[in-house]
Amino acid sequence: MSGNKDKLIAFNYFGGKFTWLEYLYKYFPDKFTHLVDLFAGSMVVSLNYKGRVIKTANEINADITNFFEVLRNNELELIRLLLLTPCSELEYNNSWEPSADKIEQARRFYVRIRQSFFGLGAQRKNKGWHCAKQHVNAQGGETVSRWNNAIEKLHDVAEVIRSNFQITNLDYSDCISR
């Protein structure tokens, strides 16, 4: 979703480790059986780890864990709805309203995270819609281009989390004690 075809990422996340993955993996033990991603965020560390281990992605932000659970369990419906969603400031502003429907809440979260400035839409406060002013990509402005390019790549993320992931929504200390 970054133009890099070798790594998976569902969305950019403030504090994410996407660009640091190779460096981080060098410090992983040679042999271990369980990768616990305590502060999973965009799950980029565990999504891209190639070793054969049990993967547990823990994130305290319920919007993030809901998004990944919906992507895992309702991939086609979520992606269908996202493809119908325009890249627009009104859509972004409306996405802050909570929904009782898990699929709709996941869609709204993805709108917030992908259409916000630097992915700050994962936070609990509206930091503003990312309006492209300078950068023109193949599909138009930077915001629209990134929105359009990212959605279809969610299929790859869904496939990986279905195959070998446990997703938890716990405080880090509760996750460790398990």
Report residues per predicted region.
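SAM-dependent nucleic-acid methyltransferase catalytic core
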Residues: 2-20, 72-178
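SAM cofactor-binding core of SAM-dependent methyltransferases
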Residues: 26-97
